[in-house]
Every structure is written in structure tokens, then in C-alpha cells.
Amino acid sequence: LETWLIVAIVVAFLVWRMMPAKGVQSISAAQLKNILHDKDKVFIDVRTPAEYKGRNIPQFKNIPLGSNFNHLPKDKEIVVICQSGMRSSRACKQLKKQGFERVTNVRGGMSAY
């Protein structure tokens, strides 16, 4: 019984961690292709510089997770990508906490692109 309780708590925690942050929009890689040339959006890739150098989307600027996002314009939508969607989800939460209103995560990241 005690083991099942621990397992349930761990599963609940993992599900909670994967949930999108409040107010963060989520789009697919296919939807991303339709907005790549929108000048009212800022595209950031939060992977490491080595990952970015290996393969990237030209419209995305490399700003690794953990960097300071304060220099980004708060009046534009920020579209965030990583390799799988996990780091970009964390970056989106960080951006929302810093007061960015329009934040969008690319589901599945570069793996889905």
C-alpha cells in the first residue's frame, strides 16, 4: 500500500510538471511553419549552442534555457522551441513569470519539425 502511494505521488508530480503554464499557447510544428515569417513574433530556440549549430530554423535566435530573457520585447509574441518541447515549456513558464503576456510553445520541438 505504501509503495502504491509513493508511485501515485511520483506520477502526479510528473503529470503536473508536463502541464503547460497558465496563459502559454501551444502550437504544432505544422502550425509553426505557417507563422515563421510573421514580423510581430520573436522566435527563440532555448537549446544549447551546440544543438542549435547542428540544426536550426533560421528565424529562431539561440538563447539557451537559463539565459536572461529581459532584453526581449514584451509587446511581441514570443515563440519558443527546443529539441523535444520540455525545455521550451520551462522557458515559457519563466517568460510568463517575467511578465511576458504572449508566449507560445512549439509542441514536440525540433524533433517534430
Question: Where does each model-flagged region fall?
Answer:
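Flexible, polar/low-complexity N-terminal or interdomain linker segments that lie immediately upstream
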Residues: 1-42, 46-53
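Short, composition-biased local secondary-structure segments
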Residues: 2, 61-68, 72
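Residues at the C-termini of beta-strands that transition into short coil/loop
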Residues: 30, 47, 64-66, 107
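Short active-site oxyanion
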Residues: 37-43, 58-59, 76-77
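Conserved beta-strand scaffold positions in the cores of enzyme catalytic domains, especially
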Residues: 43, 60-62, 103-105
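Short loop/helix-cap segments at secondary-structure boundaries that form the rim of catalytic
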Residues: 52-58, 70-73
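Glycine-rich, phosphate-binding/catalytic loops in enzymes
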Residues: 59-62, 96-98
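Catalytic cysteine-centered active loop of the rhodanese-like fold, especially the PTP/DSP P-loop
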Residues: 67-113
